[in-house]
Amino acid sequence: MTIDCPYDEVIHQWSSINVLSNEFIGMHYKECNREELFKLYTENSEGLVIFTLGANQIMYGRKGEMPKFFTPYHVDVVSTLGAGDTFKAGCVYALLKGMSDLETIQFASALAGVAISRFPLPLNPPSLEEVQALIKNS
């Protein structure tokens, strides 16, 4: 898995998942249309491509597919510190557990959702039960 990696890099081409943050896209591809950029990413990898946009819809998919969208879970936000890293950690966990693309997005989104509902995150990390409850109850 990799994060914020250009579409023409070897690491992207061989990654199982590439998570691209809104910040990275805005800095490196500010002139590009998101749908066209997404197509460049998916055409250059067999892996799952994920564009995150904070609280806005997540765009994800694979080569040869139309992009799919997922709206992150609504939670009471206490601090967004660590949200992106937590989402990415959720993708690693999902990859290791063999989750489907949708399950990966759901799990990573729920993990980040639980994480931003508390502060400080390092002293109170999300539990698997909390993540599963957010998915189930949303």
Give, region by region, the residue ranges found by the protein language model.
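Conserved phosphate-binding/catalytic region of the ribokinase-like
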Residues: 34-138
